[in-house]
Amino acid sequence: ISLGLVGSEMCIRDRDIIQGTCFRDPISIIAGDYEDARDSDIVIITSGIARKPGQTRLELTQTNVNILKSITPEIVKAAPNALYLIVSNPVDIMTYVFTKISGLPENQILGSGTILDSARLRCGLSEHFQIAQSNIHAYVFGEHGDTSFIPWSGAYISGVSVDEYYDLEKKLGKDIEPIDKEAMLQYVQKSGGEIISKKGATFYAVSSSVCKLCSLLVSSSESISTVSTMMHGEYGIDDVCLSTLTLVGPNGVQGKVPMRMTKAEIEQLKKLSLIHISEPTRPRLIS
């Protein structure tokens, strides 16, 4: 693993990671430059300033876009065949900009998108229903941020819709309240900001989600995940990066997986997709 860190002071900062490698499988960690990433299989881009308490992801936009523009030519030159995983916030805009300026095929580019948001949703539903997260299939679509939304028509617990599962639990004599869907959405959207306000940053859940995505990209089989990719007419949305169900694997992005949603949900997704990266702002972002 080559950490994209430039400067001698970064060698000290990554020492904390290096000294923990004895407890894991053999791995090499270095603080290097672009040349050290030559011919990489996967490049993870996390460059940019971090969110401060009370700050939204979108407020990071111009600064982080400028940083991304400055590093893209060099990293793409060093690793033109790599799969690129964009994690920097605001991740959907960053994925859009990288897709537009890198010149790489779109199957090589994906953003971490709402994979963490979907995990937070599963966590919230697990806590509410007192059921293992592995039994829950529910997803967050759209932007990784305050305009994400939950297509509840596609939320299931072991093949049973969330609404029907509540009725089932009541019949079994469980003491359980109806799920407050708006409160659950707020739980998903605000979790990151609340954690940042208490400890300064999010580390563990986001790093776990990135590791999971990397495992999908090196797996011998394909998997479906809510990653951010360029939309080409799916659900009536075009020329914007956001998260829907996407088939990913060792060859990167294989395509979108259409999920049956209600007309109201599709219209909501279309409406929200225009908020975080409106058409008038797109040329300015990539110029």
Describe the function of each predicted region.
Residues 8-40:
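Conserved N-terminal Rossmann-fold NAD(P) cofactor-binding segment
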Residues 47-49:
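Conserved NAD(P)H cofactor-binding loop of Rossmann-fold oxidoreductase domains
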Residues 54-58, 258-259:
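Short acidic, glycine/proline-rich loop/turn micro-motifs
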Residues 56-123:
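Rossmann-like NAD(P)(H) cofactor-binding subdomain of soluble oxidoreductases
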Residues 1-12, 276-283, 287:
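Short, small-residue-biased leader/transition segments that mark boundaries at the very start
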Residues 53, 94-95, 286-287:
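Glycine/Thr-rich phosphate-binding loops of Rossmann-like dinucleotide-binding domains
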Residues 102-108, 118-263, 267-274, 278, ...:
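C-terminal substrate-binding/catalytic lobe of Rossmann-fold NAD(P)-dependent dehydrogenases
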Residues 44:
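N-terminal Rossmann-like NAD(P) cofactor-binding module of classical short-chain dehydrogenase/reductase
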